Amino acid sequence: MGFYAHHILPRITDLAMRNKETARVRAAWIPCARGEVLEVGIGSGLNLPFYSPEVRRVYGVDPSVELLRMAHKRAAAASAKVEFLRQSAEESLPLAAGSIDTVVMTWTLCSIPNAPQALQQMKRVLTASGRLIFVEHGRAPDAEVVVWQDRLTPLWKRIGGGCHLNRRIDELIIAAGFEIVELRTCYLPGPRPMTYTYQGVARPTYWGSV
């Protein structure tokens, strides 16, 4: 990774994700987290102000040194204890199976190289009654938008840190062994190929579960 990926892209990412619309969406979902939380792709820590007092600890995973540096600063004002893990989400997480009450990922799954493997790690660490809270952009339902998502994704991955515009977020979550219990989809303000959003909650499923 070069200078752009290490130093420029993290600042662009922080700025792009720090606006009224994303703050509104964060405020709708992040307070639903409870107990021990794993935030996958914590980035610069923009979710931290939205965690409720019912969160005891947040484990924040991210591979970017620069984004974690920004997150450390925001963690100082967080209501919960925050511990950072610098690694990719699909790597084996140094957390015990069934030790996490809530997994949170916002605008993250698009950029994980091996998304199915990362989701398996999330499922592994969740308790049986745990929840996955997700806010992700991905493949739109409209053919005229999908055409552009497919055309732009190869270039977008190069300039956007591996971000895919065309991933089917709900299908990825279900295929990893989750049941989606709440799902809202919509276009957020902005260019449609980049802004179709999946927001919701999922729970892990197991063979024989009711």
Give the positions of each predicted feature.
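Conserved alpha-helix/loop element of class I SAM-dependent methyltransferases that forms part
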Residues: 16-36, 46-47
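A short acidic, Gly/Pro-enriched loop at the edge of an enzyme's catalytic core
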Residues: 90-102
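A short glycine-rich, Lys/Arg-flanked "PGG" loop and its adjoining helix->strand segment in the class I
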Residues: 116-128
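Short alpha-helix
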Residues: 161-177
